[in-house]
């Protein structure tokens, strides 16, 4: 025969209370609003447990009404009460669940679920989150009746060394047919939590998608539901319409446009989680802020945890939406978020899924994908520099403006490559118009070779990684040597090279220029890039591309190395340097002019603009170019 203990008893906490409260207030939670989220989450867990146990024992649902959560503020005295009609707790469960930090109200229950391989959505961490209420309460009274039990019990504590457990008073027991009533005796500075608008604000922000109704019970009015009680991402795609997704996007993202892409799925297996992500159709104003923060919200069992969990890599920070885990604990601190292996697995899987969805969209709805790329391509390309594992997939997604006049994929580029062309050519700059006029394109254009024109700031970085696509390396037209000898010009009869005549003066001209310019350039070479212009500047064969060097120098992250000056031996200005009638002063002016006009064509100013203007005036007045 079992004897019911009806005596009141004071018990110590298994964990020292001051240390416990310090953990809650300082280590885990930074805002006091969180206490209500935790209590609502616990109530939701209790309702989940009741729903699960009632499958095997329907009588548990016989009394107590439909599952719901009630919040009751009272200003005389200052108490805030949270009530659920869930599974409830008996005496020992109150001691076990609320007497320690080490054991939560659902741990033993989870053991049963694990053995049954079912009900993962019932995971909870009741004991830990409950103590967050001491941030706003001087004392807490909990009265609970286990579903199907005749006894109700009251647990109470003022946050000292322990707690009291006793049979519930007749009045308290009468209020609770099943479930739990938590009464917070608020601190004076927490009186704001008695205001209806404050309660509604917190519920809207943190608990709107709890699947059970949350009712606010005012002192002078009728109870009313204050949450939507519908986690759309937990529903099947077959139940939802396009309009449902549009409305969800506006609620989740706080946006006014329509989504350009929607990704909704549920992952099952080692981890269970629901994903609902949207790509906006317009670019947010803070897309390129230095912090590069994402805007995907983390939920755990429909309870909002944070919007700052780095759930996706920075190059996907334009996405908006929700990831709702069934397995993560609710008490995730910032450090835990950064180091949690389960979260890392979710991030990896969801990132792969997003890239796959973008690839599918590019294939099946190219016009819709083009909208996303036009808005967020510069951000996605950051992944080419940062995400080595997915670089090839991201390269396949990328779209580039080219000299062919349209945005193309690298697959399209490779398909259109000229016979004997072995490299994918590109040019980086800060202006599309300036790139189109860049003299480094001349020889490629004469052969009909397509060139990628890259103008986003990130382009100078990701192209420095020595990438290839389909076995074809990417090659900058502003770095190192280029050789188009095996690719004929489009009109070979009109534009035949005369190498023997050109090479006759090559050594002389180069010697004159080197003597004049000294260490302003690292070398002077005859160009294979130029057909019409006199000169251009390129980077050497090793090290960063010229555009990246300039960017780093502007950011004071390194001095740009001396460029290589390439000259067109067939240009009259260059030929004038070999003219025996040209004196040293003219040769110096011509040499500097070749350097300075190349700088201007690259978007730079001459080192000494006044000296440049003087040289140009002298050459015009002397008619050197005309008679050269």
UniProtKB/Swiss-Prot annotation:
Region feature (C): 551-628
Cellular compartments annotated: Cytoplasm
SUPFAM superfamilies in UniProt: ATPase domain of HSP90 chaperone/DNA topoisomerase II/histidine kinase, HSP90 C-terminal domain, Ribosomal protein S5 domain 2-like
A GO term from the CC aspect: cytoplasm
InterPro entries named among the record's database cross-references: HATPase_C_sf, HSP90_C, Hsp90_fam, Hsp90_N, Ribosomal_Su5_D2-typ_SF
Region of interest (B), ranges: 335-550
Annotated stretches, region: A: 1-334
Protein keywords: ATP-binding, Chaperone, Cytoplasm, Nucleotide-binding, Stress response
Molecular function terms from GO: ATP binding; ATP hydrolysis activity; ATP-dependent protein folding chaperone; unfolded protein binding
Domain of life: Bacteria
Any single Pfam family the record assigns to this protein: HSP90
Entry's family note: Belongs to the heat shock protein 90 family.
Complex formation: Homodimer.
Functional note: Molecular chaperone. Has ATPase activity.
Name under which the protein is recorded: Chaperone protein HtpG
Record gene name: htpG
């Amino acid at each position: 025969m079992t004897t019911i203990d009806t005596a009141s008893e004071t018990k110590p906490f298994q964990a020292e209370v001051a240390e416990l409260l310090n953990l809650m207030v300082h280590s885990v939670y930074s805002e006091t609003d969180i206490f209500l989220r935790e209590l609502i989450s616990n109530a939701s867990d209790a309702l989940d447990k009741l729903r699960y146990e009632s499958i095997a024992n329907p009588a548990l649902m016989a009394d107590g009404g439909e599952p719901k959560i009630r919040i009751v503020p009272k200003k005389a005295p200052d108490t805030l009460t949270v009530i659920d009609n869930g599974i409830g707790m008996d005496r020992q469960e109150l001691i076990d669940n609320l007497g320690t930090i080490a054991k939560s109200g659902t741990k033993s229950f989870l053991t049963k679920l694990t053995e049954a391989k079912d009900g993962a959505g019932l995971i909870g961490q009741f004991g830990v989150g409950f103590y967050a209420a001491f941030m706003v309460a001087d004392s807490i009274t909990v009265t609970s009746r286990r579903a199907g039990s005749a006894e109700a019990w009251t647990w109470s504590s003022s946050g000292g060394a322990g707690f009291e457990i006793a049979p519930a008073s007749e009045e308290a027991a009468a209020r609770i047919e099943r479930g739990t009533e938590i009464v917070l005796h608020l601190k004076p500075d927490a009186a704001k939590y008695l205001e209806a608008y404050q309660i509604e604000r917190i519920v809207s922000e943190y608990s709107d998608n709890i699947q059970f109704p949350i009712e606010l019970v005012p002192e002078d009015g009728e109870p009313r539901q204050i949450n939507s009680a519908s986690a759309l991402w937990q529903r099947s795609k077959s139940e939802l319409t396009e309009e449902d997704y549009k409305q969800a996007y506006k609620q989740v993202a706080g946006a006014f446009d329509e989504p350009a892409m929607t990704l909704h799925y549920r992952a099952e297996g080692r981890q269970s989680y629901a994903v609902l992500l949207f790509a906006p159709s317009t670019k947010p104003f803070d897309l390129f802020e230095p912090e590069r923060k994402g805007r995907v919200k983390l939920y755990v069992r429909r309870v909002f945890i944070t919007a700052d969990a780095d759930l996706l890599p920075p190059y996907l920070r334009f996405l908006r939406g929700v990831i709702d885990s069934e397995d993560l604990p609710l008490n995730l601190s910032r450090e835990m978020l950064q180091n949690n292996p389960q979260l890392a697995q979710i991030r990896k899987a969801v990132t792969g899924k997003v890239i796959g969805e973008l690839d599918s969209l590019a294939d099946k709805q190219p016009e819709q994908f083009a909208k996303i790329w036009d808005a967020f391509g510069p951000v996605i390309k950051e992944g080419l520099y940062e995400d080595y594992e997915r670089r090839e997939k991201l390269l396949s997604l990328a779209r580039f403006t080219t000299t062919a006049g349209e945005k193309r994929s690298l697959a399209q580029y490779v398909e259109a490559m000229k016979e004997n062309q072995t490299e994918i050519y590109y040019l980086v700059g800060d202006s599309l118009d300036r790139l189109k006029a860049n003299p480094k394109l001349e020889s490629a254009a004469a052969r009909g070779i397509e060139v990628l024109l890259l103008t986003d700031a990130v382009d100078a970085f990701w192209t420095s990684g020595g990438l290839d696509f389909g076995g074809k390396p990417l090659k900058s037209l502003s770095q190192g040597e280029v050789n188009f000898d095996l690719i004929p010009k489009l009109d070979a009869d009109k534009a035949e090279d005369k190498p023997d005549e050109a090479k006759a003066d090559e050594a002389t001209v180069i010697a004159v220029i080197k003597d004049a310019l000294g260490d302003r350039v690292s070398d002077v070479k005859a160009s294979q890039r130029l057909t019409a212009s006199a000169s251009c500047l390129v980077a050497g064969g090793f090290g960063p591309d010229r555009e990246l060097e300039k960017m780093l120098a502007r950011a004071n992250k390194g001095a740009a190395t001396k460029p290589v000056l390439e000259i067109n031996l067939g240009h009259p200005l260059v030929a004038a340097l070999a003219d025996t009638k040209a004196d040293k002063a003219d040769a110096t002016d011509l040499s500097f002019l070749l350097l300075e006009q190349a700088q201007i064509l690259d978007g730079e100013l001459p080192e000494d603009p006044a000296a440049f203007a003087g040289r140009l005036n002298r050459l015009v007045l002397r008619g050197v170019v005309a008679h050269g």
